[in-house]
From Swiss-Prot:
Highest taxon of source: Bacteria
Keyword terms of this UniProt record: 4Fe-4S, Electron transport, Iron, Iron-sulfur, Metal-binding, Molybdenum, Nitrate assimilation, Oxidoreductase, Periplasm, Signal, Transport
Naturally occurring in which organism (per UniProt): Paramagnetospirillum magnetotacticum (Aquaspirillum magnetotacticum)
UniProt binding sites for [4Fe-4S] cluster: C43, C46, C50, C78
One GO-annotated biological process of the protein: nitrate assimilation
Gene that encodes it: napA
Keyword Zinc on entry: no
Family: Belongs to the prokaryotic molybdopterin-containing oxidoreductase family. NasA/NapA/NarB subfamily.
Subunit and interaction comment: Component of the periplasmic nitrate reductase NapAB complex composed of NapA and NapB.
Lineage: Bacteria, Pseudomonadati, Pseudomonadota, Alphaproteobacteria, Rhodospirillales
Name of the protein: Periplasmic nitrate reductase
Catalytically driven reaction(s): 2 Fe(II)-[cytochrome] + nitrate + 2 H(+) = 2 Fe(III)-[cytochrome] + nitrite + H2O
PTM annotation, UniProt: Predicted to be exported by the Tat system. The position of the signal peptide cleavage has not been experimentally proven.
Length: 827
């Protein structure tokens, strides 16, 4: 028998990786079982978008492996990806709806008891109708969704809320991870998502990581970065972070900086480029405008907070005024290497070495960033400022030169951003505040004019505040564990969920912290149990077919959304004057208006893929995934967000939009690569009316909360390689749980010694908002500098978000999980 290279990779990659990690061999490395059907899928975890091969036997996923035909991961998976087959089969998987009850009826303080789906939707409909009939009813219902929703789940939810209930109180958990990236793109370019792609990795000369531990959070991309660094002569890697982590092992220019001073470092780089006369004058003259951003914008806290007082531009944080290049030059001139070195704690020679990488016109640079930038009280600013650097040099929109925002969730791009499940967005970068955009959406959705509410809904952090204040009363959480992952859960999150005025529904496959705080839990189908689509960080849309049997364990989010819509007649949710504009809708349900509208329901069951069980199609009598996708795609076709026909994605390993005439786009905004840039235009940032990107003058600003004599340490939160987000899936995989069973507090040995602590001691970590008990680790993979501690958030037994502050970027409304003040003492 002979093995092809592809077969060799399939046979050896999994056991080799498991052995290297010291874990038990995954199922795929065991002797092959008979009658296993293999098909392509997409990894359930981060935003890299790795393709996997999924093995199914008797309706159960029994094995997965990296897909050798994938252009993203090329046959590899990270350690989480190799155990994907086990995430759906935890012993505590939920199978029936559960309602808090006492004496046979709902009671907010009752115990969870199983009920039927009809009973669940009946009480949900009762609670929603009770709120919607109030004069301000549209503000009293809300939903918190997910960057883990499939594309059509997010789209269906957006239609239900923004069109059906006429409420924009829909926001995704991507608000906590990607909102600053979105705001940064929109402010600088007028259009969202990266202009480059992963192919940049193999064509660049230097990598700069800003607040990104790619070695653990995006390990497959890191393997490609490592390969480039080790095989391309002269290739350099710079890593900037507030603490040392595994990505530092490859760093030629390692930099640990004081929290929040990345703002100053970015301005120093611009100053260096201009002072050395290294900037690309021709590019700037043709393709850039300069803007002075508003300052004194606050910290996104409650208006009564002391930090929100006397903030002149808190109401208009996105404001920007024109300025000249010379004015920008003068603005950044104060950020000298001496000043920034003192402020940031980074030696001057390292700052200069970093600036030289960007300033050398012969060196192609890829800048990667993720939560260290985005989860920041000035998250939009730092996104704008990294674009400043690339735009000054013209190092953008071409192979190997790319500012690249990495994504944390599998479809934060494809669902949250592109579909527009944020409280202010519609599909294809449209927004609810724009009259023309609302008209387009109403036309696409076949709705009467004036249906969509022009008022922005409650964003994620505001939703918790409104729940606590009793102003948001019927609330549905789907595909996310927000009680564990949202900030300041003691003061804002938990009180809101348990407010007697509120009815909280959580759809989840497992009894998470969030589910256990709810009033009603709906069991959901997971991953390969349903037909799905994700969009990854490089604009790649990928599909998969339904492989497992979901109906016996739970119902998909899509089915739940569409089925719930049947409980509402138009007369119960729309005012009479709106119905009068389209009287033929009178008497119809929201299901008929939104999903059986002649567009979503136009694809019959005969178009389903043979050999796959589609529970939603069986339930509704048509192919809803195809209908929803094609209706959604109509928003972006011809508007630089073009998606290919539905069938194309089931055949391909994903396509990067815009897809025009069957061809995907690798680099946007540059002639020869982007079909929306005409011959002779060279570079065109067509998201802006004049085709020019914006460079912003934005200053250093201190953090919302810093260490003081009472709380003397910075706290930063984040993840580890073996677990993903809140651990609700990975902690149910025995091998992953065994490898890292609990979170620890990473601490500098000197900080431990000052407190008479030793490695492994049990400690109490306290902030002004709460406290947790954990163990300290002074010898681990993460090595904080003195004065800072780091703790992951995957462990539900140690809820680190009891400690965090709910400060946000005032522009993006994204939470800063990286900076608050704590004290540590022996427990």
């Amino acid at each position: 028998m002979s093995l092809t290279r592809r077969d060799f990779i399939k046979a050896n990659a999994v056991p080799a990786t498991a052995a290297a990690a010291g874990l038990a061999t995954p199922a795929i490395a065991q002797p092959a079982k008979a009658n296993i059907r293999w098909d392509k899928g997409v990894c359930r975890f981060c935003g890299t978008g790795c393709s996997v091969l999924v093995g199914v036997q008797d309706g159960r996923v029994v094995a997965t492996q990296g897909d050798p035909d994938s252009p993203v991961n090329r046959g590899l998976n990270c350690i989480k990806g190799y155990f994907l087959s086990k995430i759906m089969y935890g012993e505590d998987r939920l199978t029936r709806p559960l309602l808090r009850m006492k004496d046979g009826k709902f009671d907010k303080n009752g115990e969870f008891q199983p009920i039927s789906w009809d009973q669940a939707f009946d009480i949900m409909a009762e609670k929603w109708k009770e709120q919607l009939k109030k004069p301000d009813g549209v503000t009293r219902v809300g939903m918190f969704g997910s960057g883990q929703w499939t594309i059509w789940e997010g789209y269906a939810a957006s239609k239900l809320y923004k069109a059906g209930f006429r409420s924009n109180n829909l926001d995704p958990n991507a608000r906590h991870c990607m909102a600053s990236a979105v705001a940064g793109f929109m402010r600088t370019f007028g259009i969202d998502e990266p202009m480059g792609c992963y192919d940049d990795i193999e064509q660049t000369d230097a990598f700069v990581l800003w607040g990104s531990n790619m070695a653990e959070m995006h390990p497959i991309l890191w393997s490609r970065v490592t390969d480039r660094r080790l095989t391309h002569e002269g290739c350099k890697v710079a890593v900037l972070s507030t603490f040392e982590h595994r990505s530092f092992e490859l760093a030629d220019i390692p930099m640990v900086f004081t929290p929040q001073t990345d703002l100053a470092i970015l301005n120093y780089i611009c100053h260096y480029i201009i002072s050395k006369n290294a900037y690309n004058k021709e590019f700037i003259d043709k393709h850039v405008n300069f803007k002075k951003g508003a300052t004194d914008i606050g910290y996104g806290l409650r208006p009564t907070h002391a930090l929100e007082k006397d903030q002149a531009n808190a109401a208009t944080p996105d404001k920007a005024d024109p300025m000249t290049f010379d004015e920008f030059k003068a603005f950044v001139a104060e950020y000298t290497v001496e000043k920034v070195s003192k402020l940031s704690g980074v030696p001057a020679d390292k700052l200069e070495a970093l600036a030289k990488l960007y300033a050398d016109p012969k060196v192609k640079v890829v800048s990667f960033w993720t939560m260290g930038f985005n989860q920041h009280t000035r998250g939009t600013w730092v996104n704008n400022m990294i674009y400043n650097v690339h735009l000054l040099m013209g190092k953008i929109s071409e192979p190997g030169n790319s500012p690249f925002s990495l994504t944390g969730q599998p479809s934060a791009c494809g669902t949250a951003r592109e579909v527009g499940t944020f409280a202010h967005r519609l599909p294809a970068d449209m927004v609810v505040m724009n009259d023309k955009h609302r008209e387009i959406a109403e036309r696409c959705w076949k709705l009467p004019a004036g249906t969509i509410n022009p008022k922005i809904g409650y964003h994620a952090v505001l939703q918790h505040r409104m729940l606590k204040d009793g102003k948001l009363n019927a609330y549905w959480v789907m595909c996310t564990n927000n009680m564990q992952t949202a900030p300041n859960m003691n003061e804002e999150g938990y009180p809101g969920y348990r407010n007697p005025a509120n009815f909280i529904v959580v759809s989840d496959p497992y009894p998470t912290v969030t589910a256990l705080a709810a009033d009603l839990i709906l069991p959901t189908a997971m991953w390969m149990e349903k037909e799905g689509a994700y969009g990854n960080a490089e604009r790649r849309t990928q599909f998969w077919a339904p492989e497992g049997q979901g109906s016996g364990r739970g119902r998909s989010d899509l089915w739940q959304i569409m089925e719930f819509s049947k409980r509402f007649k138009i007369e119960e949710v729309w005012p009479e004057e709106l119905i009068a504009k389209k009287p033929e809708l009178r008497g119809k349900t929201l299901f008929e208006v939104l999903y059986k509208n002649g567009q979503v329901d136009k694809f019959p069951l005969t178009e389903l893929q043979a050999g796959f069980e589609n529970d939603e199609a069986k339930a509704f009598g048509f192919y809803p995934q195809k209908g929803l996708f094609e209706e959604y795609a109509s928003f972006g076709r011809g508007h630089a967000h073009d998606l290919a026909p539905f069938e194309s994605y089931h055949k391909a390993r994903g396509l990067r939009w815009p897809v025009v005439d069957g061809k995907e786009t690798l680099w946007r905004f540059r002639e020869g690569y982007d079909p929306y840039v005409k011959a002779g235009e060279g570079v065109k940032f067509y998201g802006k009316p004049d085709g020019k990107a914006w460079i912003f003058a934005l200053p250093y600003a201190p953090a919302a909360e810093s260490p003081d004599k009472d709380f003397d340490l910075w706290l930063s939160t984040g993840r580890v390689l073996e677990h993903w987000h809140s651990g609700s899936m990975t902690r149910r995989v025995p091998e992953l749980h065994k490898s890292v069973p609990n979170a620890v507090l990473y601490m500098h040995p000197n900080d431990a010694a000052k407190r008479n602590l030793r490695n492994g001691d049990v400690v109490k970590v306290a902030s002004r908002r709460g406290e947790v008990t954990t163990r300290i680790d002074t010898r681990g993979r993460n090595k904080p500098p003195e004065g800072l501690v780091f703790m992951p958030f995957f462990d539900e037994s140690q809820l680190v978000n009891k400690l965090t502050l709910d400060a946000t970027c005032p522009i993006s409304k994204e939470t800063d999980y990286k900076k608050c003040a704590v004290k540590v003492s022996k427990a």
